[in-house]
Amino acid sequence: MRSVPGRVEFIALLAMLFATIAFSIDAMLPALPEIGADLTPDAINRAQLVVTSFVFGMGIGTFFTGPLSDVFGRKPVLLGGAALYITASIFAAYAETLELLLAARLLQGLGAAGPRVVALAIVRDLHSGREMARIMSFVMMVFTLFPALAPSIGAVIIDVTGWRGIFWAFVLFSSIASIWLMVRLSETHPRENRRPFRLKTFRAALAELFGQRVVVISIGVQALIFAMLFSMISTVQQIYDISFGRAESFPLWFGGVAIFAASGSVLNAALVMRLGMRFLITAMLSVQVVMAGVTLALFAFGLSGTPAFALFLVWQLSVFFQMGLTVGNINAIAMEPVGHIAGLAASVIGATATVAGVLIAVPNGLMFDGTPVPLAAGIFIEAILALLLIRWLVRAEAAEAA
């Protein structure tokens, strides 16, 4: 018989699993200056790779965790990922070179891919329809608060223990979540429902997936949207510190922006049925082209002081806010023609877009020169390309329907 905790405990457990990702990214941001000074003092921009290497590993892991959980069950994959995450965190705590730290962070990301995919599958195993949507809305409500808190938590830990202490916090966090999962939740995907992995079927599904123009274009749009986010996240701490001299208050500003940005998902839920997914994506990307273009122009012409910081703050909010009105919608568009292979499609689409987004974001972040200009230029270009792609998709769909 399945053992399922009560609703409040179930939601809290899932939220903690999801929060592993936000904690692993956002709590690291205050540590980047110390990591740069300790491990790469001659090229401090390379400390950004501590963020993007984790996301890259998570993207790769997303390819495998969904299918593996269908074959072996949800709990073994989640707990195996947690074991990898904890082991990698310990290695990271003892890393003496940036290269070893980046390798450990990549392995951390691989382990963290489990909560990203498998926790959602657990909800789907136990609930469906409106009840599933209700459970996930509560989970995401809790989850969206974590990016607001994580930098402050990270800053406190780093002040007390130094940057290596943050990895021991990751070990503790994941250990608590894993023990909670083991003790309180039974396997939700019983053996009789599992499917053996067949390479031939997998290849055929991939060929079908990437043979759909709407899927390929949607992945391109999503990758560029992710690139904007990853570029901002990997560079934002340096901009607060070096460009504006606000390193100490960074966690508070970042938390405030994250709280306001979370309302993007709420607004999307209210508007998407009336205005449509394609319109909202096009509108938000158009706004981002204008915002990034104005930011680029004003910083290039030497805007400084409080007005410059206020402009950056508004622009940062726009980059985070647009995620709530674009990513879910572009995912839904990509999934429209491949509902019969939804599980595989979700994993492959998410993984491909994440990995591509990281590969685009890394050079953008490494160009940081002490000002927001390189970041604004990169996001301006990414927004234009994403806007062109979604417009191409809309026109192609209109032509096919005619």
Question: Which residue ranges define each predicted feature?
Answer:
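Helix-loop-helix hairpin linking two adjacent transmembrane segments in secondary transporters
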Residues: 100, 134-183
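Extracytoplasmic
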Residues: 9-41, 232-237
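Extracellular/periplasmic helix-loop-helix junction of adjacent transmembrane segments
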Residues: 32-59
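Paired small-residue
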Residues: 84-91, 99-107, 310-315
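Conserved MFS/SLC helix-loop-helix module at the cytosolic interface between two early adjacent transmembrane helices
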Residues: 59-99
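Cytoplasmic helix-loop-helix junction between adjacent transmembrane helices
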Residues: 104-144
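Helix-breaking motifs and short loop linkers at transmembrane-helix boundaries and internal kinks
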Residues: 73, 94-100, 111, 128, ...
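Juxtamembrane intracellular "pre-TM" segments in multi-pass secondary transporters
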Residues: 1-3, 188-218
